[in-house]
Design a protein with these regions (language model features):
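Conserved histidines in hydrophobic membrane contexts and catalytic metal-binding motifs
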Residues: 1-241
Length: 241
């Protein structure tokens, strides 16, 4: 049958290989790259220092507001798993309130019980100094999201803090909680670029469920199957000689 002839499978294998070969190379090369650096280095975690712990003596000395006062002020429902955390933010003790269902976190001054607003650019840079081994040079508040950005998946606004080293390093700081949201370096950007090639999502860089990836995955399977069938047919032909 001509449709199932060796010539047909040879041509099918050749054309399928031509179509998917570049993407197969991208999958292999990016997979090799992903296996080399430690993922913690990609995320910049090696630059983080230990988070300062709450000093009990400091709490007693500064006479902080009782947690029951914050519970009443923020109208917290403990039965709904809403929480109050005592933390440091830019050198000050704060209460961080997390409501349920998830809303924007609320911050209260632990000394006065008053609600607090965003940290300043100077405070954002001081947090980078305190929480990392990096030296900040500038801080800018980001309010607008951008498809495929370095800070995608994180709530805005964020402070974008530029540091001296590593070169082109950026630290993103949450202006509400004062926490380090992300650290981005050239290594992370290389990883992110190759990740977009790997999953074939060149804009958002996070979506596995898109037609292009499915198409080339299916073509890759067909290429392998056609090669196996071609090998099988070739073996039968040679054995018949």
């Amino acid at each position: 049958m001509k449709f199932l002839s060796t010539t047909f499978f040879r041509k099918a294998h050749r054309w399928l290989g031509l179509i998917v070969s570049i993407q197969l190379l991208m999958w292999t090369a990016s997979g090799l790259f992903f296996s080399i650096p430690d993922i913690t280095d990609v995320r910049g975690e090696q630059y983080l220092t230990q988070t300062p712990s709450i000093n009990i003596n400091q709490m007693a000395r500064e006479n902080i507001v009782s947690i029951s006062t914050i519970i009443d002020t923020a109208k917290i429902n403990l039965e709904a798993s809403e929480t109050v955390l005592l933390k440091h933010r830019a050198g000050r003790l704060i209460y961080q309130v997390e409501k349920n269902p998830p809303e924007k976190k609320l911050i209260f001054d632990a000394l006065t019980g008053q609600p607090m607003t965003y940290i300043t650019p100077t405070e954002a840079m001081s947090i980078v100094v305190d929480r990392t081994e990096l030296s900040p040079t500038d801080a800018v508040l980001i309010n607008q999201s951008k498809t495929g950005s370095e800070f995608r998946g994180r709530d805005l606004p964020l402070y974008k803090v530029t540091v001296t080293k590593p070169k082109k390093g950026i630290v993103y700081v949450d202006p509400v909680t004062g926490e380090i949201a992300a650290i981005r370096t050239k290594l992370w950007r290389a990883w992110d670029f190759l990740w977009s090639l790997h999953i074939m999502d060149y804009q958002e860089r996070d979506d596995f469920s898109q037609w292009l990836l499915r198409l080339f995955s299916a073509l890759g399977v067909l290429t392998v199957l056609s090669g196996i069938i071609l090998w099988f047919y070739s073996g039968k032909v040679q054995s018949g000689k």
